[in-house]
């Protein structure tokens, strides 16, 4: 029983295998009825523990692409080749039945405090469930009771308006905020996790409505600002600043650091819960992810000025462009001086493991975790920095941004990274061109989101809500290469690391020879020099802001209707 509870507490894998056997022996599902269950706190906890399996997988969190990461393995969202499927994992409803089953019979628990707490847990997860559904499909059926196969509701109910469903989501989150515990726990949902989720949900919905021409966006942004401000003022969470590389430590730490992290997926070798972030970031066969040049350019100089205001920035090589930058740059990608955890040797970017030359190190632990599926560092789901950024953006979108908001949100994030934290007076032209807006504060907030939340699964949603899906079609650029057939030192240790060529590989010891042009995945922007290009066909269209309803669901219930552009 204890092993089962620990397993589910981590919220990182579906209930199964030997870790569930004790629990299933004690509470066989064929005898789990409303009359004999949900009477005690242990029973309520045991049942609701399974809800934690709804959280995104590790690869979904760190494996994002959007317009920030290039890799060889791409999702249909990025490729733009999604068609109307027969079925879809994102249209599954089983977890909703489990949640509603609990809420229907939780009154069996006579202890009101316990009952309300676990109803808060269930409603937190129902809000999470429906937020994901609305992001993917827009209008969806709202169901607040358990339904089984054969229930007429399955065949007759159409989709409810997005507005109605989102109001229900907010009602669930408000209930969770009121009834969940205030004590910190990175592995269990709390009041602070509910406020952080409400902050995320309301920012998404408010800005999606604003940039997609829907009404009532102001009320959602006001709700975001209110929830975020309460979190900032009352939760006690803050930006983690310990050590010389606090940003990197926040993600490479084996155990979630609860100074800043509100909710995390836990991993534990002892009970077989592991992921593969080390392999993903270092292997030559797992997609070869690399930061894109357009995002690398967004990292500021330490004095707070844009990198793109430096003379000659367009043709700087990696060692030069890494100097005097926002500390998060060197804590996100390999730059001169980088050493693996528990190693004293300098590690240059490996072009066989990264498509762009900007090899990622966020989350990366020591080399002993490099083998397949061996990583055990916890992965953050909600953290204080995101809530701060949500607050800043909501206030900016509402026209209520000022120095006080800047100082409570953007300044501490930049100062942790060793960047001068003053609020800029003029808009950065590079950002204006990239995002197509002129507001200086809004641009700086978008800069911070791109940098601070990179590889945390937020970027695709950001582009969708800002109505910037076309960014997924842009050319992918990597590091600048001055010339072909010339070996380069990428990490400044005096030893050459890489050479780009159209001919045969050379034989200089320690140099990786990268073929460009012809049938290679690579080319150079100006044929013989320039930014590294990685080209793959992508086709984002307006209809891809929402997914199509699966055909099987429409066959069963035509009243669901298909999303407009997918008809």
Question: Where would I find each of the regions flagged by the language model?
Answer:
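Short coil/turn linking the two alpha-helices of tandem helical-hairpin repeats
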Residues: 134-135, 141, 184, 204-213, ...
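Long, intrinsically disordered, low-complexity segments
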Residues: 92-93, 168, 247-301, 374, ...
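Bacterial N-terminal signal peptides that target proteins for export
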Residues: 1-8
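An aromatic- and glycine-enriched ligand-binding surface/loop that stacks and positions planar moieties
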Residues: 21-75, 174-175, 188-195, 200-351, ...
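C-terminal motif of bacterial Sec signal peptides marking the signal peptidase cleavage site
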Residues: 16-19
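Flexible, polar/acidic helix-loop-strand segments at domain edges
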Residues: 315-384, 562-567
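Conserved, well-structured interaction surfaces
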Residues: 42-49, 55-57, 72-137, 153-167, ...
